[in-house]
């Protein structure tokens, strides 16, 4: 029982690392706090589910969702945890190392810790100050630091504020 509980706690910790891809370096050293109206743990399948008014904080990171599911694969599978968050929408806020805020939202957020790959699906948006990108699907490869956006049946919309881009170059 203790071993399984420890594994789930480790999974939760790793899950928070997923949202730390953009965050302050110090955020990953901060305590992870998860508050929800309900929580369930499936020890046999190594799945922990948080539902209703889920709020996750770690340092400058703030995530709000209707539901968060963290799945840990079998020990010898060679795979790592996945995190899925669902909401209307899921929102997240964090500060970057340069002190600027990064905000995002989507109906579904999926993070594969093994691949270090983040997918925002359904009315996805990433915003930094007044610059933003909107699409049906936005993916971010953390290792390669590559972002891609797809508009689905619509087009991807990007708004860049030149003065904010110039300020970034000065820092």
Please identify what each model-predicted range represents.
Residues 1-171:
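Mature-chain termini and adjacent capping regions
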